[in-house]
Amino acid sequence: YISIPSASAVPRAVFEAVGGFPEGMKIGGDMYMWIKIARRYAVCFSPKPLANYSKVASNRSALSYTPERTRYSFEELYDPSAPEEYNEFVARAALGKALIISAKGGTKEAARAAEFFGYTKTYRRTLRKVRVLNALPRSWRAPLIGLYNSLAWRIARKGL
């Protein structure tokens, strides 16, 4: 990740220069803004843990979904003249968002992201997950992705 929002220090002038958070974008707005910041400014990373992240914290915004009404899209962050790593990171952010949107029933939006960001070489697994999830009945998607994430989290913590 470019930035974990709870552990970021960004001057107000930088937020203002990149236009702040994208108005109307409910999912991925923070990542959208971090990408815009990293495109224009130097970003420093410290491997030292400076914040804790809780996987069990409640996320009220995840409880309901209504389609976004925004003029902003990760597609506009794609830059054919940028280094491959940059566009791969944009694809990663967009496909992660597409997974959430598909799980919540946004079939068309997720399919559009899968088509546009199908160029990814690094995040083929995420691309396949979006396509598979999108092919399932809507009522199956959220429980299935929840089960997948739960199992992946347990395996990562305890190993096989």
Where are these regions (language model features)?
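Conserved nucleotide-sugar donor-binding catalytic segment
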Residues: 1-67
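C-terminal, non-catalytic tails of nucleotide-sugar-dependent glycosyltransferases
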Residues: 9, 66-92, 146-160
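Intrinsic-disorder/low-complexity coil detector
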Residues: 21, 79-82, 136, 142
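Catalytic core of nucleotide-sugar-dependent glycosyltransferases
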Residues: 49-57, 61-88, 106-120
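Conserved small-residue packing positions in alpha-helical repeats and bundles
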Residues: 98-99
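Membrane-interface aromatic/basic loop that binds lipid-linked glycans or pyrophosphate carriers
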Residues: 102-160
